[in-house]
Amino acid sequence: MSRGATARLFVALDLPADVREQLSRWGRAVAATPGPLPALRVLEPQSLHLTLCFLGSRPVAEIDALAAALERCSQPLGELAVGAPLLLPPRRPRSLAVAIGDPAGTLQSLHGSLLVALSEVSGWEPDRRRLRPHITVARMRSGARGGVEAPALPVPTPQLTFTPDALALYRSWLEPAGARYEEIARCELVPELG
């Protein structure tokens, strides 16, 4: 790659395979149910993740430093819970997601550590809004967007709890069929002792 090459990057929690499968199955059930939602394109299970920081287009030369920053942020996470369905963003929704509960507050702590560490090793300026943890399960087809209210869905969200064990730096490509992700660095989260 040339010296000025860039990559579209984000940091996310990897999800256990069974959680990805159940959420994808739920998304397919919602998409197949007639109702108030427009046409949905359900994401493949391997594409599901919990984004913590979207870095945007960054110089490829920063990737090693960003990966090292992930390692420095490794900390135990408490149990997370799948919550209510969300249409995001609320005013002009483009995606169907599920809220993620963080009763112990460990996800917020990890997010804060990442904001500091990632901005210290790059020119990235973080968005200082509080993290609103969610997992995007489906995208609305472009012709069907706009003005959709969050309906009561006939298919309840799965009652799932999980404890993530890895944090990853991903590269994404925007393609006509949807975003494609490549994991380029991975950090195992330190397990809680006790």
PLM features: what roles do these ranges have?
Residues 1-194:
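Histidine-dependent nucleotide/RNA phosphoesterase domain, centered on the 2H-phosphoesterase fold
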